[in-house]
């Protein structure tokens, strides 16, 4: 993911 709170990237 683009957000830092995304565990899967």
Curated annotation (Swiss-Prot):
Q: Which residues carry this modification: Glycine amide?
A: 9
| Pfam families tied to this protein | Hormone_4
Q: Where in the cell is it found?
A: Secreted
**Any one cellular component term from GO for this entry?**
extracellular region
Query: Which cysteines does the record link by disulfide bonds?
Result: 1-6
Assigned keywords, A-Z? Amidation, Disulfide bond, Hormone, Secreted
Q: Name one GO molecular function term.
A: neurohypophyseal hormone activity
Q: Which domain of life is it from?
A: Eukaryota
The main location is: secreted
User: ATP-binding: present as a keyword of the record?
Assistant: no
Q: How does it assemble?
A: Interacts with oxytocin receptor (Ki=1.5 nM). Interacts with vasopressin V1aR/AVPR1A (Ki=37 nM), V1bR/AVPR1B (Ki=222 nM), and V2R/AVPR2 receptors (Ki=823 nM).
Instruction: Please explain the role this protein plays, according to its UniProt record.
Output: Oxytocin causes contraction of the smooth muscle of the uterus and of the mammary gland.
What protein family is recorded? Belongs to the vasopressin/oxytocin family.
- The protein, known as: Oxytocin
Organism of provenance:
Oryctolagus cuniculus (Rabbit)
